[in-house]
From Swiss-Prot:
Part of the 50S ribosomal subunit. This is Large ribosomal subunit protein uL24. The gene is rplX. It comes from the Bacteria. GO terms for molecular function: rRNA binding; structural constituent of ribosome.
């Protein structure tokens, strides 16, 4: 997957289109990501030993990875990610707009 935990992403479709947020977790088997402050759902819970009080809890739900786009830390624009190899053999993620290295994979 092109997106990793801690990346800043932009939502490009759906009810939260245009919102930015950090990736909280990545679910590669389902091809989904959880972004903080985006796709908030209300979950009804019963009282348990951990949570003495039941009620309605708001939490972020996963989004399909095709609905988010990585924001390059160098040019601060949403971009696609290319994977290239350096001379020493390391694989890195590269911004397709400004050609800067985002980080190593």
């Amino acid at each position: 997957m092109d997106i990793k935990k801690g990346d800043l992403v932009l939502v490009i479709s759906g009810k939260d289109k245009g919102k930015r947020g950090r990736v909280i977790s990545v679910l590669p088997s389902e091809e989904k990501v959880v972004v903080e402050g985006v796709n908030i759902v209300k979950k009804h819970t019963r009282p348990t030993a951990k949570m003495r009080q039941g009620g309605i809890i708001e939490k972020p739900a996963p989004l399909y990875r095709c609905k988010v786009m990585l924001i390059c830390p160098h040019c601060n624009q949403p971009t696609r990610v290319k994977h290239t190899f350096l001379e020493d053999g390391r694989k890195v993620r590269v911004c397709s707009k400004c050609k800067e290295i985002i980080d190593r994979v």
